[in-house]
Amino acid sequence: MDAVAAEPVVAPVLPLPAQVRDLGMQDYVPVWRAMQRFTDTRDEHTGDELWVVEHAPVFTLGQAGKPEHVLAPGEIPVLQVDRGGQVTYHGPGQLVVYPLLDLRRLRIGVRDYVCKIEQALIDTLGEWNIIAERRDGAPGVYVGGAKIAALGIRVRRGCTFHGLSFNVAMDLEPFHRINPCGYQGLQVTSVLDLGGPSGMDAVKAVLLDQLARQFGLVLQPTSALPDLSLPA
């Protein structure tokens, strides 16, 4: 009888721990530099983390960003950064989450990673009966044609940084000073404008739960903050 090759044994993917760090309100650059350092120095033993933050007002241009999409920034600073995507705005009342995940350990590719983030946002909005959708070729989440969440990611050595921004209860006027995500005339909206809660904590709790469900994570909140100091 011919020998039958044994099927390779694949260990089950168990829920993986991930620390959650709530950074509160922070300027953009110190957080950006900190997640770069975290990603550059991590190895296969480094645990995954989710950083949650609100940023002081800033426009960021991704690697594909074109300066002509910044129409009239006024007093708001404009930064060229190393994420994917075009131009977007960050400001108070917007929930920003930076997943610092090892995709190899999670056994997913970049496309699945993006889809899971979008689905977590869609399911979060569903908690308040807000029907949202994704668009082919235009990462992010939309409600009735208006963008409510933007994605801008970077993957280095299989590990993610940068992430998502979710308009909860914010002044949307600065979006009129740019072509959001490079699309002229793209409308934006917020959770509050669509009848959802104004409280950041309520939205934050639901979104973190949905991200944990999508990625198979056990969240471990910690009060310790990353080193946000800037090199001299």
UniProtKB/Swiss-Prot annotation:
Top class in the EC scheme: transferase
* Pfam families, A to Z: LplA-B_cat
EC assignment: the record states: 2.3.1.181
Which residues belong to any copy of the BPL/LPL catalytic domain? 44-219
**Any idea which residues are catalytic in this one?**
181
* Entry keyword annotation includes Repeat: no
Q: Known catalysed reaction(s)?
A: octanoyl-[ACP] + L-lysyl-[protein] = N(6)-octanoyl-L-lysyl-[protein] + holo-[ACP] + H(+)
Q: Which GO terms describe its molecular function?
A: lipoyl(octanoyl) transferase activity
Instruction: Please provide the record's keywords in A-Z order.
Output: Acyltransferase, Cytoplasm, Transferase
**Primary location recorded for the protein, binned into one broad class:** cytoplasm
Q: What pathway or pathways are given for this protein in its record?
A: Protein modification; protein lipoylation via endogenous pathway; protein N(6)-(lipoyl)lysine from octanoyl-[acyl-carrier-protein]: step 1/2
**Subcellular location, record wording:** Cytoplasm
Task: Report the family membership.
Answer: Belongs to the LipB family.
Please, what other remarks does the record include? In the reaction, the free carboxyl group of octanoic acid is attached via an amide linkage to the epsilon-amino group of a specific lysine residue of lipoyl domains of lipoate-dependent enzymes.
Protein function: Catalyzes the transfer of endogenously produced octanoic acid from octanoyl-acyl-carrier-protein onto the lipoyl domains of lipoate-dependent enzymes. Lipoyl-ACP can also act as a substrate although octanoyl-ACP is likely to be the physiological substrate.
Protein's name according to its UniProt entry: Octanoyltransferase
Give the species this sequence originates from. Xanthomonas campestris pv. campestris (strain B100)
Upper lineage is:
Bacteria, Pseudomonadati, Pseudomonadota, Gammaproteobacteria, Lysobacterales
